């Protein structure tokens, strides 16, 4: 009788564990769906483009500082940030010190951003230090 009770208790524990796992899975799935819905409703394609441009601009400044593609800024360039117009089609990249940003460096940064992000150049205008 004692072994029979142990088997019943063990099976009940397993049943509770299985039910808890299904409950946890259902809560996790509902959370993922809610977050996904929230993000898709609150962030547009333009928001993603701005995020991609910002990441590419940071990388371009790092590459320019390292002498990539023969660029020699003579000082350490500092990525200062990004801003954009109301319609999010004009994107401005700020790099300092401004006096050391040559047209060659500007062209490299802008072309690097367009090449990496694959955004439409006729739709989005990127300017360095406007």
Curated annotation (Swiss-Prot):
Q: Does the keyword Secreted apply?
A: yes
What residue ranges are annotated as transmembrane?
Answer: none
Q: Which domain of life is it from?
A: Archaea
Q: Where is this motif: QXSXEXXXL?
A: 15-23
List, alphabetically, the GO terms of the cellular component aspect.
Answer: cell surface; extracellular region; membrane
Keywords of this protein's UniProt record, alphabetized?
Fimbrium, Secreted
Signal peptide span: none
Chief subcellular location equals: secreted
Q: InterPro entries recorded for this chain?
A: Class3_signal_pept_motif
Q: Where does the record place it?
A: Secreted; Cell surface; Fimbrium
Q: Which Pfam families match?
A: Class_IIIsignal
Q: Which residues form the propeptide?
A: 1-14
| Cysteine pairs bridged by disulfides in the record | none
Give a short account of its post-translational modification: The N-terminus is cleaved by the prepilin peptidase EppA, which recognizes the class III signal sequence.
Q: What is known of its domains?
A: Contains an amino terminal motif QXSXEXXXL, which is part of a class III signal sequence.
> How is this protein named in the record?
Probable pilin MJ0835.1
